[in-house]
Structures are given as C-alpha cells and as structure tokens.
C-alpha cells in the first residue's frame, strides 16, 4: 500500500455529479493498493498516517500529528500510484490491485479511519474525480509498505 501524504491548507474532491467533499487545514492523502496488500498494510498505513508529526507547534516544524491538531483528512483512492514506467512509454499497472481488491482495501482503510474518530472524508472508488488543493510548504511524504520488504 502506498500513500502520498500532502500537508494542505485546503483540499476538495469534486465528483461527476458536482457534489464534493472538502477540508481546510489537514492532510490530502492519495492511496494506492498493491496487488499483494493485506489487512496489515492497512493497519500500518493508518498507524503511520495518524502518528505522522508533520504540523508545526511553537514555531517548530514537524512537532504535531493530525490527531494533536484535530485537523482533517481527505483520502483519495489512486490505483496509478503503482504505475511502472521503467519499460516503454506507457505505464504498466500490473502491480496495482484489481478493482475488487482495491475497493475492498480502500473501503476497509476508510472504515478504520472513521472508527478511529479522526475527521476524514473520501473520494468515490473507481470514479473520475477532480481534486483541488492548496499545499502548505509544500510538504509531501511518500510511504510504501512494500519498501524494505
């Protein structure tokens, strides 16, 4: 499982019917599911995400977590995070989870976040969405549960 975590002043996802979810201060997270991901990958990502000290406190950067600051999360599913461009010019998505596994893992990820009590919002799986954000920093962190295995 791979996350691109962006510290944002605001973020918004707009759906095909023009409805939307939005946040102010918080984190915009793009979540990619690997074909070999299991439940422990979800748990590890959530632990890292909720404990990540990325926000400032007393004029010091990287002191507080999203929980400490009571900020919000916007999580967008993004199968292209496992796109491989090492051969040719067209990305290969053979490492991305198929639609069934991807949806199951994304839904489980979101349910665990909701149950944690964090203020979080999501996108709609396997749907074209428009994402707007105002990055703060910019600060972008990439975390992949497959690295180091």
What is the predicted role of each segment?
Residues 1-89, 100, 104-149:
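N-terminal, polar/charged subdomain of small-to-medium soluble alpha/beta proteins
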Residues 90-95:
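Short glycine-enriched, charge-decorated loop/helix-capping segments at active-site entrances
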């Amino acid at each position: 499982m791979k996350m691109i975590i962006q510290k944002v002043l605001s973020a918004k996802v707009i759906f095909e019917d023009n409805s939307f979810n939005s946040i102010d201060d918080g984190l915009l997270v793009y979540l990619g599911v690997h074909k070999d991901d299991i439940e422990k990958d979800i748990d590890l990502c959530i632990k890292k995400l909720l404990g990540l000290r990325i926000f400032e406190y007393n004029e010091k950067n990287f002191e507080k977590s999203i929980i400490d600051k009571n900020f919000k999360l916007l999580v967008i599913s993004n199968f292209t995070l496992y796109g491989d461009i090492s051969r040719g010019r067209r990305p290969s998505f053979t490492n991305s989870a198929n639609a069934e596994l991807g949806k199951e893992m994304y839904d489980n990820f979101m349910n665990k976040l909701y149950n944690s009590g964090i203020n979080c919002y999501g996108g709609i799986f396997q749907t074209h969405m428009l994402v707007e954000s105002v990055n703060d920093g910019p600060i972008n962190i990439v975390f992949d549960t497959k690295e180091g295995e």
